[in-house]
Amino acid sequence: MIFLLLINFGIKGYWKMKSYSFDSQLKEVWETCHEKGFSEDYCILVDFSRPSGEDRIAIIDLNTSSVLDTGPCAHGRGKGNSAWKPSFSNKEGSRCSSLGHFKIAEKSYSATVGLRFALDGLDDSNCNARRRNILIHSSRYVGIMHHLTSYLPLSDASWGCFTTSPAMLKKIESICDKSKKPILLYAYKSS
């Protein structure tokens, strides 16, 4: 099994990976936060054009325009998805991820995924997020596999949710807990 994974997905290098720049999204995100009453201190960006096992999700300090932390983020396993290429949908039952602006809503716990945050979709591309039960949650699978491969093999870790490592979810929890205003999550895919 491990051998097949290495052949199919490659061994992820432990050398310094190229740094990721989210500069082109920061102005638009800050304006959205300012106009709609979101935290102007922090936001979460998810760049679906990056490989799922690499630094695809980022916590951004909007005051300094700096990246505080990054981590892996699995995409949904719905129809048309592969480990290399996500497809997107807002339809119930699609098991695909959605793009756009989301409000990070209430925190809760479940027996299946543990700590989780509900998401409210704010755009036409994700307005069914609450009905679809799209969440931010973690998976040990994502936490382990991102050390081995740049592309996370599709699994039940995500049916459209933003599934990250347990360590990254704790960092997201920390900024959500200390913020007096809701945090914006913006998911996008560059061409």
What are these regions, as identified by a protein language model?
Residues 1-8:
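Hydrophobic membrane-insertion alpha-helices, especially the h-region
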Residues 13-159, 166-183, 188-191:
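Cell wall/extracellular polymer interaction/catalysis modules
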